[in-house]
Structure formats: C-alpha cells, structure tokens
Amino acid sequence: MNVLLGSVVIFATFVTLCNASCYFIPNEGVPGDSTRKCMDLKGNKHPINSEWQTDNCETCTCYETEISCCTLVSTPVGYDKDNCQRIFKKEDCKYIVVEKKDPKKTCSVSEWII
C-alpha cells in the first residue's frame, strides 16, 4: 500500500509540474468498497463517481482511488499590460480585462492559459 501511495504522490507531483491546472488527492480505503466516499480538502465527503465545484473555482471528481480537481479558470495573458488590467470575478470563476484609465471599457485578449 505504501508503494502505491508513494507512486501516486510522485505521479501527482509530476502532473502538477507539467500541468498546474489539475491535481490529484489519493483516496485511501479498500478498493471495491461501494460504501466508501471521498473526503475533499475541507473535510466534506462525496460519493464515488460524483462531481462538484469548489469555492476556489475548481471542478473535482471522486473516483475509487483518487479525487481529481481541475481549475475552471482561464487566465488572460495576451493583452496590453501597459494600458489594461485583469480583474478576477470569483462569482463567475473568470477574469475580465479592462482599461486601467476607464474600467468600464474592456480590452481585447488574444491568448488565455488554463
């Protein structure tokens, strides 16, 4: 079991370094136990094969062996940083890009990253 857990931790670290938009949390317990649930980082329990959205704008899925969480937020990177600024709207889980001098005017964005 320790070897499996160690492998999952190494895999999760590798995935995080390659693609920081998702991460995995090992789901400890006995495989095949259908009464098992996943416990998220806040201590909430979720049924196996369920999906939920976190307060941090992530969507998480409970699997038998792990919880997989991925960001819902795309970050603007291709915009005029001298004249525009990005503002995060947590209630919508998205960024908007507006002019610094007149925040009522939006700026065009050519590139986004997840």
Swiss-Prot record:
InterPro entries registered for this protein in UniProt: PSP94
One GO cellular component term: nucleus
Taxonomic superkingdom: Eukaryota
Keywords of this entry: Disulfide bond, Secreted, Signal
Pfam families cross-referenced by the UniProt entry: PSP94
Signal peptide segment: 1-20
Disulfide-bond pairs as recorded: 22-70, 38-62, 57-93, 60-69, 84-107
Subcellular location: Secreted
Tissues in which the protein is found: Strongly expressed in prostate, liver, kidney, breast and penis. Also expressed in pancreas, esophagus, stomach, deodenum, colon, trachea, lung, salivary glands and fallopian tube. PSP94 is expressed in lung and breast, whereas PSP57 is found in kidney and bladder.
PANTHER family: BETA-MICROSEMINOPROTEIN
Misc. comment: Specific receptors for this protein are found on spermatozoa and in the prostate.
Stated family: Belongs to the beta-microseminoprotein family.
Quaternary assembly: Homodimer; Interacts with PI16.
Disorder named in the UniProt entry: Prostate cancer, hereditary, 13: A condition associated with familial predisposition to cancer of the prostate. Most prostate cancers are adenocarcinomas that develop in the acini of the prostatic ducts. Other rare histopathologic types of prostate cancer that occur in approximately 5% of patients include small cell carcinoma, mucinous carcinoma, prostatic ductal carcinoma, transitional cell carcinoma, squamous cell carcinoma, basal cell carcinoma, adenoid cystic carcinoma (basaloid), signet-ring cell carcinoma and neuroendocrine carcinoma.
Name of the featured protein: Beta-microseminoprotein
Organism whose genome encodes this protein: Homo sapiens (Human)
